[in-house]
């Protein structure tokens, strides 16, 4: 009899836990994805904070030249970072128990792997949690689809790119200056600015910002007048009121006259789909671009594409960009290479540009 009661109590406890996890009445929805998301993001956050403050220098290039990244080792908020794991580790999984000691684990940049793996799993579960809450509330699933764009970007720079390059030391550092270094080296090695997928991403982000500003300002300006002509239209409203405050027909008329008729949406759902889809598709393409360049399918190369009748090169902006790329490449990881492959495998490049002689 006692055993039976214990089983019922256990089953009842599990059922209550399930109901609590899936309840939409909680202040913050947990969900089954949240059961994984909460501990993984907590682990990533705690490790990041500790490493950013106190981690010792990391031998990122695997040549016994540690790079300092934490605040206690001389950095500030701008220069500080969690330094990626060592090139000596490569793509090997490097948890704490694989190192001979905690000092070795820290020296080889073990915290970086701990942070990015927990972060990527937690961020993925956050997307799943968005779908789960939408499902519980009877909503359509497009919120998590939009979130997949920044998630794909995170996977591209923290996982796909290191896999393609053969080492987690090539992943993006977790800090401000480290991110800038990652961007500069990426341009030097892959010419990302000349990659069409990155260009689509730029159009998506800047265009999305423009459309967001246009939409917000237009809606804010298209008030339904609740006051007399002698009073300010602002007096007819209070912040946070439930009633609709703007007239989409008036907004459509204004914008149609400002640009032209068919540049303006007269359907609210079509408008908001466009506002969501434009930046999302752009960022998707950027993530795809990073993922292809991870395997060295790089941006366009128009070097030496214009020559005169005698075969002499007439430099274009593509050649100027190439010269900048070479300069950035020879400066990074200075002691890790005897000579950059791009320079060692070709004829010597002049230090300064030479203006072509004009025989008139």
Swiss-Prot record:
Record: residues binding chlorophyll a ChlzD1: 118
Localization per Swiss-Prot or TrEMBL: Cellular thylakoid membrane
Enzyme class: oxidoreductase
Catalytic activity: 2 a plastoquinone + 4 hnu + 2 H2O = 2 a plastoquinol + O2
EC number: 1.10.3.9
Ligand binding (Fe cation): 215, 272
Site (Tyrosine radical intermediate): 161
Protein name: Photosystem II protein D1 1
Organism: Thermosynechococcus vestitus (strain NIES-2133 / IAM M-273 / BP-1)
